[in-house]
Amino acid sequence: VVVLAAAVLFVCYWRQSLTQPISSDGAANALQAWDMLHGNLLLHGWLLSDVSFYTTELPQYMLIEAIRGLGPGVVNLAAAMTYTLLVLLAGLLAKGDAGGREGRARFLLAAGIVLAPQLSATSTLLQAPDHTGTAVALLVVWLVIDRARPRWLVPVAVCVLLAWIMVADSIVLLTGIVPIAVAAGARAARALAKRAEPDWHELSLAAAAILAGVFGVMAPLIIRAAGGYTTAPVPGHIVGLDRLPGAARVTFHAALNIFGANVVAAHSALELAFAVLHLAGAALAAWAACL
């Protein structure tokens, strides 16, 4: 049943992806993967954007191109595959170790919240790589932490996975590495205060996250020193408080887009109806974050 549902979702996401033209970003990613597939594994001579996707989406593109060749359809297929995995992994993580009706309810609730990406968000979620693949890889990390028994292999796997992701997308520093280090460190400190002895598993997870950040920073530098690709960092600067309302509005709309609940961006009555329906999912996620 799960395999059939995944196949149906994949086809639906692929069809939705086809409604938008391929951007130059997606075309560049396809060409990078094609170059890697033909021997230029370090992407010598390439100047990439601030997010390289070198260890996440580019290997995925290579796999698809090895099967069907180079073409614009690679972007659509990869995006559909990525979003299908996102839905399934979100459901599995929410299910936890629950079984029976509770397990199914938890799976369906989490998967249902992210099930139907809004049409206005197609170019973000179902086109060229835009952190969605990073979210898929990060869900795998959460699953390892959640499901695996506490043993030395767990922090090792977490460190390797987080470093692997960070090579592709440094946003994982904010969405994965720092949260794990802080949460695991806090739990270890609480255990030390209660039992007068450290929780070595939590301490090792915090250390694994910190080491992953170091490795994730060093790896692209090593690749560059070996003659591989270079990246163009995003210029950043501190803005005044007068820019805060506009930035907050953009952030709010982006969050609604993730849940398919951006009522402002709806272009038709049907899309508006779905957006209003998805507001319930966004509200549930906000409520869970506050617990």
Role assignments for model-derived ranges:
Residues 189, 203-280:
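Membrane-lumen/periplasm interface segments of specific transmembrane helices
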Residues 22, 50, 54, 97-146, ...:
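Membrane-interface micro-motifs in multi-pass membrane enzymes
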Residues 41, 59-81, 86, 98-99, ...:
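Juxtamembrane segments of multi-pass membrane glycosylation machinery
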Residues 7-43, 62-66:
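Extracytoplasmic loop-helix module adjacent to an early transmembrane segment
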Residues 2-5, 77-101, 140, 283-290:
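Transmembrane-helix motifs of polytopic, lipid-linked glycan transferases
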Residues 153-179:
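Membrane-interface alpha helices of multi-pass inner-membrane proteins
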Residues 88, 184-194, 268-291:
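Hydrophobic, aromatic-rich transmembrane alpha-helices
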